Amino acid sequence: MGKGDKTHINIVVIGHVDSGKSTTTGHLIYKCGGIDKRTIEKFEKEAQEMGKGSFKYAWVLDKLKAERERGITIDIALWKFETAKFYVTIIDAPGHRDFIKNMITGTSQADCAVLVVACGTGEFEAGISKNGQTREHALLAQTLGVKQMIVACNKMDSTEPPFSEKRFDEIVTEVKSFLKKVGYNPATIPFVPISGFNGDNMLEPSSNMSWYKGWSVERKEGNASGKTLIEALDCIIPPQRPTDRPLRLPLQDVYKIGGIGTVPVGRVETGVIKPGMVVTFAPQNVTTEVKSVEMHHESLPEASPGDNVGFNVKNVSVKDIRRGSVCSDSKNDPAKESKNFTAQVIVMNHPGQISAGYTPVLDCHTAHIACKFAELKEKVDRRTGKSTEASPKFLKSGDAGIVELIPTKPPCVESFTDYAPLGRFAVRDMRQTVAVGVIKSVTKDDGSGGKVTKSAAKKK
């Protein structure tokens, strides 16, 4: 395979706060990644000076995180690494304050979640307890449609005795049982005993665990087996990018560029956009023609899902459209404004309870929407989705329910089954994510009488 031929995949690393996510991720980036020798040497020197000689790999990530949180745009290559088959981008790792929000409004959808659990005595139990984040992260991944999972059983070097087969088996049994409850099929999940710190079973089979015969998975796309974490990553089933769906492109920004005009910028979520196409922006219901499409300052004949593009539109002012607007093909299921919508929400960390009338802010794709919980229709079992109570008075942390939401100003959202990236949202209140949801159905405005530019009218 030539260098340019590898498929790009996105992973998200999840697990309890002390499970060793940073060390494990850092190890992969360090050994297979985009960090050049000079940077590593610089980090190592700093670590030694600070007396963090044992920094190993987490330090790499701490540096990157600190820079990312200070808003320094760091070279995104630092979050990438390569396997035999894939270019892997780590789209986020928790511990980051906005992790949950990021995972939902996701700059992109993760193709696979790597769940890191710590196997040290007492550590695993803490992570999986009622208050541990292990379950919450796994549930979140499942709710947001991350279909594939790999479990890295970390810190095998600190079990009693070290590298204990008995402890590994015990943990695998436990994790399988709760992943099943969340909705994953354990037969499709590789379980790999590793030490992210020492490197056991990360890239090469470990001589410390000769008892480990390897992982194997059964799935309709074909069975697979291997011994190491990197091999498990290599067996991820690459996603089908949704080029055949109608266009949906949520805007991140709209620029006015002298001599060119209005340039909306955003990421193609579904479908394709190309010059000459007549597009409609919702909820504003503005229709115009695309003059050109650019990515990284080069003009493109067309852009497809995953591409971050800027495109030039004719006779539309910067005042007409804004961040959160959605661009669509006016001739193929154009996007419309959403009057109200029904969603399934899971309440995560709300200190009190949510009842009808509650009006928080929803983050859905690039839009920021004030919304009223108009009606709590039913409480449902999180795992099965079956109704457990009709018209509940309130929902509290841990509950899931079907609710009717009415936005204060109509946005453009879609049902999760039609356009997944536009159908997931985070409910934000008190500066944190209090619930997550997926949209089941949307009442749309038929949107007659919008603005149509001359060039668009000509093409109709």
Swiss-Prot record:
Chief subcellular location: cytoplasm
InterPro entries: EFTu-like_2, G_TR_CS, GTP-eEF1A_C, P-loop_NTPase, T_Tr_GTP-bd_dom, TRAFAC_GTPase_members, Transl_B-barrel_sf, Transl_elong_EF1A/Init_IF2_C
One GO MF term attached to the UniProt entry: GTPase activity
Region (G3): 92-95
The UniProt record lists the keyword Nucleotide-binding: yes
Cellular component GO terms held in the UniProt record: cytoplasm
Transmembrane segments: none
Localization (cell): Cytoplasm
Residues annotated as domain tr-type G: 6-243
Region feature (G5): 195-197
Region (G4): 154-157
The keyword Transferase is assigned to this record: no
Residue ranges, annotated region (G1): 15-22
Alphabetical keyword list: Cytoplasm, Elongation factor, GTP-binding, Nucleotide-binding, Phosphoprotein, Protein biosynthesis
Modified residues (5-glutamyl glycerylphosphorylethanolamine): E302, E375
Superkingdom classification of source: Eukaryota
A Pfam family per the record: GTP_EFTU_D2
G2: annotated segments: 71-75
Reported function: This protein promotes the GTP-dependent binding of aminoacyl-tRNA to the A-site of ribosomes during protein biosynthesis.
Family membership: Belongs to the TRAFAC class translation factor GTPase superfamily. Classic translation factor GTPase family. EF-Tu/EF-1A subfamily.
Name of this protein: Elongation factor 1-alpha 3
Upper lineage: Eukaryota, Metazoa, Ecdysozoa, Nematoda, Chromadorea
